[in-house]
Amino acid sequence: SHDNAQLLTAIKAYIATMCDPKMAVIMAHEIGHGGYYGYCRKIPCAPEDVKDDDIGMVLPGTK
């Protein structure tokens, strides 16, 4: 099984390759069922506050 911290770090690194440098905050959250959502934006937020203009991606479950 994957280590969650390593997986979240990998997601953040991948998202960073797509981020505008001004989008300083890169975040990743586990969203249940082993799925993860990562995004970059100017300020941190909870997953439910992610806005349409955030760069984001949902990864399928890995568990």
From Swiss-Prot:
For binding Zn(2+), which residues are annotated in this chain's numbering? H29, H33
One GO molecular function term of this record is: peptidase activator activity
Please provide the Gene Ontology terms (biological process) for this protein: proteolysis
Task: Tell me what controls its activity.
Answer: Clotting activity on human plasma is not abrogated by the plasma proteinase inhibitors alpha(2) macroglobulin and murinoglobulin.
Q: Where does the record place the catalytic residues?
A: E30
The EC number(s) attached to this protein equal 3.4.24.-
Question: What does the entry's PTM section describe?
Answer: Glycosylated. The N-terminus is blocked.
Source organism's superkingdom?
A: Eukaryota
Record keywords, A-Z: Blood coagulation cascade activating toxin, Disulfide bond, Fibrinogenolytic toxin, Fibrinolytic toxin, Glycoprotein, Hemostasis impairing toxin, Hydrolase, Metal-binding, Metalloprotease, Protease, Prothrombin activator, Secreted, Toxin, Zinc
Q: Which terms in the GO cellular component ontology are assigned?
A: extracellular region
* Cell location: Secreted
**Tissue specificity field:** Expressed by the venom gland.
Q: Which cofactor does it need?
A: Zn(2+)
Q: How is the cofactor bound?
A: Binds 1 zinc ion per subunit.
Q: Peptidase M12B domain: from which residue to which, for each copy?
A: 1-33
Cysteines paired by S-S bonds: C40-C45
Q: Which residues cross the membrane?
A: none
* Root EC class: hydrolase
- Protein family (similarity comment): Belongs to the venom metalloproteinase (M12B) family. P-III subfamily. P-IIIa sub-subfamily.
Subunit-level organization:
Monomer.
Q: What else is known?
A: Negative results: does not degrade components of the extracellular matrix. Does not induce local tissue alterations, such as hemorrhage, myonecrosis, and edema, in mice. Does not induce systemic hemorrhage, thrombocytopenia nor prolongation of the bleeding time following intravenous administration.
Task: Describe its function.
Answer: Snake venom zinc metalloproteinase that catalyzes the conversion of prothrombin (F2) to alpha-thrombin through formation of a thrombin intermediate, without requiring additional cofactors. Also inhibits collagen-dependent platelet aggregation in vitro, an effect that does not depend on proteolytic activity. In vivo, at low doses, induces defibrin(ogen)ation when injected intravenously or intramuscularly into mice. At higher doses, causes sudden death by intravenous administration due to numerous occluding thrombi in pulmonary vessels.
**Name of the protein in question:** Snake venom metalloproteinase basparin-A
Source organism lineage?
Eukaryota, Metazoa, Chordata, Craniata, Vertebrata
